[in-house]
């Protein structure tokens, strides 16, 4: 998978770890008095590399040497695997540590440890991720994302909405998009023509795509041509109940938990690495309609969470088909 491309006091206790028996560790730096440091802004650093001694010390040194202070650090070293994952949040003075210098410092760190992934984000300075949303007839996830975006709860810029379902100018979605200057593209699809070339042309400048109940299977050729991450919402608790109508499948199976799954899109249907899952208990009193209603509520929150995790640099690949979510 392709994860965020943007490339990346002190922790005195972290320097004493010469051996680590932990699977995961979270620790926080000293708090800062914001009233005495009005110029400090927030940064995030994500790191994935082969595990060797001294990584935590070097990350701390990189930030502290520029006058920064780590507020929190999340570290994961899988048992019996020489792999290191970390996510650090820090504050710094942009007058003392300019954005380009920060990029170069973290690039040096990445080269030092032969990092597989090194990313840094400064939300106050960096442009937001650009996304396109693909949706079909059911619009509960699309509407929820648009409202969250309007309320400032999704740190993205929506370049366009693409749908294979026609929505007239008097629909609430069309009016919302028109009011906010977001283009709406209706591309009617068929079994023989999924309009993938046209979609590719519309989304070429995006950072990643979101499938908000887009009921079309994207081809392997599309995935390779786009070459970036695509986040999907599945209205079922994967890996169970793949494919169409998972709510009906789950209802017929008599499950006691209903769920929703947000995952990366791969060539295998509903089998990509999972980013987020949410569940709700149901009972014998639920009918199929209440089943679906509960599922839709889960889908909205699950998809929004996955997008937020991705934008906040919380997602890293782990093993062939898993993720680390900080």
What do these predicted ranges mean?
Residues 5, 17, 76-326:
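One-carbon transfer enzymes
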Residues 30-38, 121-125:
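Flexible hinge/switch segments at interdomain interfaces of large molecular machines
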Residues 36-39, 80-82:
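Short, flexible turn/loop "capping" segments at secondary-structure junctions
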Residues 37-49:
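Short glycine-/aliphatic-rich beta-strand segments at the starts of folded cytosolic domains
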Residues 46-55, 96, 135:
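Short, surface-exposed ligand-recognition loops at beta-strand->loop->(often short) alpha-helix junctions
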């Amino acid at each position: 998978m392709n994860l965020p491309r943007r490339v990346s006091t002190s922790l005195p206790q972290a320097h004493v770890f010469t051996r680590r028996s932990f699977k995961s560790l979270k620790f926080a730096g000293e708090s800062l008095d914001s009233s005495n440091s009005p110029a400090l802004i927030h940064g995030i650093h994500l790191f994935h590399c082969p595990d060797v001694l001294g990584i935590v010390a070097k990350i701390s040194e990189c930030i502290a040497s520029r006058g920064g202070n780590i507020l929190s650090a999340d570290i994961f070293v899988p048992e019996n695997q020489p792999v290191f994952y970390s996510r650090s949040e820090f504050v710094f003075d942009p007058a003392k540590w300019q954005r380009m210098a920060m990029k170069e410092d973290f690039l040096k760190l990445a080269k030092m440890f032969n990092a597989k992934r090194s990313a840094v984000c400064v939300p106050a300075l960096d442009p937001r991720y650009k996304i396109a949303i693909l949706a079909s007839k059911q619009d509960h996830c699309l509407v929820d994302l648009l409202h969250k975006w309007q309320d400032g709860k999704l740190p993205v810029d929506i370049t366009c909405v693409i749908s294979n379902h026609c929505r007239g100018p008097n629909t609430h979605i069309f009016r919302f998009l028109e009011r906010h200057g977001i283009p709406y593209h209706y591309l009617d699809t068929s079994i023989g023509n999924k309009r993938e070339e046209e979609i590719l042309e519309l989304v070429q400048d995006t950072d990643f795509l979101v499938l908000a109940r887009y009921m079309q299977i994207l081809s392997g050729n599309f995935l390779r041509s786009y070459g970036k991450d695509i986040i999907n919402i599945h209205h079922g608790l994967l890996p169970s109940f793949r494919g169409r109508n998972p709510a009906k499948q789950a209802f017929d199976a008599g499950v006691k938990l209903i769920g929703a799954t947000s995952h990366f899109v791969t060539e295998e249907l509903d089998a990509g690495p999972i980013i987020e899952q949410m569940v709700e208990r149901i009972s014998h009193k639920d009918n199929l309609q209440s089943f679906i209603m509960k599922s839709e509520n889960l889908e909205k929150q699950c998809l929004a969470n996955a997008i937020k995790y991705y934008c906040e640099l919380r997602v890293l690949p782990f093993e062939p088909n898993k993720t680390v979510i900080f």
